[in-house]
């Protein structure tokens, strides 16, 4: 089997310890693995061909997403599927899809300019974030109208605002790898690598059901989402189509197993995503 990972080149200060291990495990099992860094070199679109059984879209860059879209148009099998990833990367689209699926979330609003949020602040604070983005970049809590200023971190596009929910305890992250669901709780802000790893917690039946709804709504099998528990109720406040899975026990082995099974299904002419277990 031939698998290609579409990746971002991490600086030495931000290593990605899990995915080198995933690649090592796959290669040890006899899989041919290529690492592709779309942001690091030109790609001649005239020469672009589907040369792998499976492409794994790990990178969060716009270049990688567009390249995955071009490969998708040529018939490539991509994990997560390109249409699902594209929806998830747009927080406005993802928020509406999750709401339609009954996923609990704070009330959300879309605006073109920060000042348009002024009337909403009369009812309490808002969490304002760029409609595209990851790793908390550009996200801020706004309490007063004076804080609604133009910010270069917004990326120049529309903004998504969510009603702020006061969290109880630590931040919680839910990860899903196929049908397996994992929970990790962390302090915020996490300053050290150990704090970023957090500690596992047992995922409740309610959170498992929410994870199932998220995956079904967006067509994702590898993803993570942030949960805020406020006044005893869970609220999904963000979702990522292919997170780092930090703090998940044996994450590399779980990922390698799932990616290998996906590639095997493709080579047999079966559907890319596994049917959910019942």
Predicted regions and their residues:
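Short beta->alpha connector loops
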Residues: 38-41, 59-63, 111-115, 165-167, ...
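Protein kinase-like catalytic core scaffold
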Residues: 126, 160, 182-183, 223, ...
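Phosphate-binding site of ATP-dependent enzymes
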Residues: 137-218
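A long amphipathic alpha-helix within ATP-dependent nucleotide-binding catalytic cores
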Residues: 191-236, 240, 248-277
